Amino acid sequence: MAANPKKQLALDTNLLLDLAEERDWAQDFREEFQTRGYTLRIGPTVVVELEWLSSSGEEPQRTYAGRAAERVSTWRITPFELSALDQTVAERFADALLDHSLIPVDEFNDGLILAETSLAAIPLLVTSDKHLLDIDETALKLAFNDADLLPVSPVHPRRLLRALR
C-alpha cells in the first residue's frame, strides 16, 4: 500500500545531521509528526550525501553523518527510489535552478533534492539549509511549473511545529 503523499514529508541531509546532533527542535519535529501519522522520507541524493559525508566529510560533520546513517531506520525514516528517467528529470531541473540563479553553483544537490521530492509527490521538504529556505518562493513555483513538476515548498521544522499550535 502506497503512503498518502499528504501524510509524507521529505527530509534533506541537513535535517538528518541536526537529528544526529540531537538538536531538541529536530527531535521534537520528528517525534511530533511521526506521532501524527506522517511518514518521513529521504531521496536518493540525501542517501548519497549522507554516505559521502560519513566517509569523506570533515569533522564534526563526518561523525554526525555516520550517526545519522546508523540511526535512519531507528528513527523510522524511509528512503524512496526513483527511476533512471526521473533522475534525468531531476538533473535537468537542478540545472534550470542554477540557470535562473535560484541556487548557488555549489548547491546543485539542493536542486536534485527538490526535484526528487517533487517526483515522489511529496509537497514539503523539511530542511534547516539556509540556501533552500532562502529561495524565492514565487520563482521556485514558476520553475516547478515550467518543468511540469509538482511544486515543493522548503520549510524549517520549527515553522512546521509552530503551525501545529
Language-model region placement:
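Low-complexity, serine/threonine/proline-enriched polar segments
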Residues: T63-A84
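Short, well-structured N-terminal submotif of metal-dependent ribonuclease cores
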Residues: M1-A68
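Short, flexible/disordered intra-domain loops and linkers
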Residues: S54-T63, H100-D106, D134-A139
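Active-site neighborhoods of divalent-metal-dependent phosphate/nucleic-acid chemistry enzymes
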Residues: I77-L124, K130-D134
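A short acidic, often aromatic-flanked loop/helix-cap motif at beta-alpha or helix-coil junctions
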Residues: V48-L50, L82-A90, P157-R165
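Acidic, PIN/NYN-like endoribonuclease modules and their adjacent C-terminal/linker elements
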Residues: M1-K6, L11, R23, I42, ...
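Short, conserved catalytic or adaptor-binding loops enriched in Gly and charged residues
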Residues: E31-Q34, R67-T74, A143-L149
